[in-house]
Design a protein with these regions (language model features):
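A conserved regulatory-domain signal marking ACT and ACT-like small-molecule sensing domains
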Residues: 1-10, 14-184
């Protein structure tokens, strides 16, 4: 895991920010409760490499970028606090923006016609209300003739069950779909 702090946010002691990020990551994969006090020790016990960097350049004055490497690859997210609310602003180099609160579907897909309609139809059929929908896509395809890669962040009024996520993945353009709950 690598945290990069941009702007003044990195000028002070960032240990609480680091530990909060670790606690969030550990909460999804550990039976032991991770918190601000024990998260660094838990990560080290698991053999995680935790690195921090401070940089002055960013589109946003103060932001935090998190890079996580797993067996399936590297995921990079960046966030800011706007109007006293944490917001995601970038996923794997694709800019999209959504408040990090409540329930969220995180989706990677090909930018082709019908994906947004598919998401709305599947959620509507399952009586799940969309509170907000944010899209972003790469500026260029990964290879000539390939569709652009896209990210969809869908805020919903309830946690989306795995059975509904599987219906989203039934569309061949949807490469990844996961439901996340952000707790205060």
């Amino acid at each position: 895991m690598r945290l990069t702090y941009f702007g003044k946010i990195g000028d002070g002691n960032t240990s609480l920010l680091r530990n909060a990020g670790l606690a969030g990551l550990l909460s999804r994969s550990s039976t032991r409760k991770a918190n601000l006090v024990n998260s660094l020790q838990m990560a080290e016990h698991r053999g995680w490499n935790v690195a921090e960097a401070h940089e002055k350049r960013s589109i946003h004055t103060d932001s935090i970028r998190l890079e996580v490497e797993t067996d399936s690859g590297v995921t990079v997210v960046e966030g800011v606090v706007l109007l006293e609310k944490p917001r995601l602003i970038q996923v794997d180099g694709i800019y999209c923006e959504l408040a990090l609160s409540g329930f969220l579907i995180f989706m990677k897909n090909q930018d082709v016609p019908g994906v947004i309609g598919h998401v709305g139809t599947v959620l509507g059929r399952n009586k799940i209300n969309i509170a907000n929908f944010s899209l972003g896509r790469r500026d260029a395809p990964s290879a000539p003739g390939e569709p652009l890669e896209a990210v969809a962040l869908v805020s919903t009024d309830e946690l989306v069950p795995e059975s509904v996520l599987a219906q989203l993945r039934d569309n061949p353009a949807v490469k990844f779909a996961r439901s996340v709950e952000f707790r205060a």
